Amino acid sequence: DFSAGANDLSYGFKRAKLAWYSIDPIFYTQKPSGISNEDLSLNKTRRIFSRELYPVTDIAQGQTQVISTLDLTYYPSERGPYNNSLNTASNPISNFGGIMRAVNSTNFEQGNVEYIQFWVLDPYVGKGETPRSNTGKIYFNLGEISEDVLKDGRKQYENGLGPDQILASPRPLWGDVPASQSLIYAFDSNVDNRKNQDIGLDGLSSANEGAVYTNFASELDPAADDYTYYLNTSGGITDRYKNYNGPEGNSPVNINDPNRGSTTFPDVEDINRDNTMNTINAYYEYSVDIQPGMTVGQNNITDIRSTQVTLPDGSSTEARWLQFKIPVSQPENTIGNISDFRSIRFMRMFMTGFSSELSVRFGALDLVRGEWRRYTNTLDFNDTNVADDNTNLDVLAVNIQENNERCPVNYVTPPGVQREQLYNNNSIINQNEQSLSLRVSGDGLEPQDSRAVFKNVSIDMRQFKK
């Protein structure tokens, strides 16, 4: 649980460094000083084109042919923000780094959300691949997740800070916190006050953080929460994004500041911006292993796409993409008091178990819903309990764009079916074509047994005579 029950600074002792970002196109079109073609040819930084992941997808004229990947670079041996531990590097596999977000459509049962589906570039294949001994897990949490990032029961919001604001007294564990209730999330229009507000979730500037993070009081950034713009630093691409997610100083007053900000809004302990801080933990947990030699049929992997790509340095390398489909209805663990999928307000993703730096690149990351629903009642009047058959039914969608090279059986367009065509800017764009796939697993179907799906429709049939 990574010291989740702690009520002191040890609550953050297992938090390691994690950077999440989408690489700016400027690195490929107008290379900043210090960035070479060799840097742009690494598996973790090279540009991903649509034809690599979706080779049969037609791109309309004028549309981008580049996939803007979500990249996560995890540094398990380096302390993350608000971590006062001196032992982060001594046992990296026990550390974690994670991110969370709000979910807009919260009723998964009504929306029939069935899968967490994503494409990941295999980090163990390609130029600059990850050492094969560096393995771990990616976890996903769905449900009610505490927004109290720095656990103290008080909601931090940066625009409530500053010399003219009322702060909690005595000072809470992690730093300064506003004593008043938030009404809006907007910085002060006064330039001087603004500088005193954009100081991170601990409510302390770097000059004052040493009083709390005493083990690192001599460093320039004792709380390890400073923001750095990726074009205002040096090193490789992943090095430049290393501090891009820091909340202190990420909203500079002057828009012409070379240290350009990442947001114009205050950082708050209110992920879904409903003006309240949720402190309840009641969620479902899922995970996938990240390791060499991942294959279809294991670890929730449903498809693999391998191809050769040409790199900016003139060489070529193999690219191996893995498609994961995690059934939402089959969590590994259930934490807290949650019994259904009618109120899934948050999603969290975190990495753990790795021994050294690792970059994971998501070509797509979706919550997938279906129009077809499983029929859970019995179809055999002699067997009223279908739950004891150990028969699993997966309801999937397969399509020509993503699964045309799927192993062991690839998807092909059915006989007599032609892909719908769209005329766009004097060009013909073939639309995606897909089918419903029913897959039985577990012990399979018993003799004379069956499984079914159904679909709710709203069609008035009274106007038809037959």
Listing of model-derived features with the role each one plays in the protein:
Residues 1-466:
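Extracellular/surface-associated beta-sandwich interaction domains
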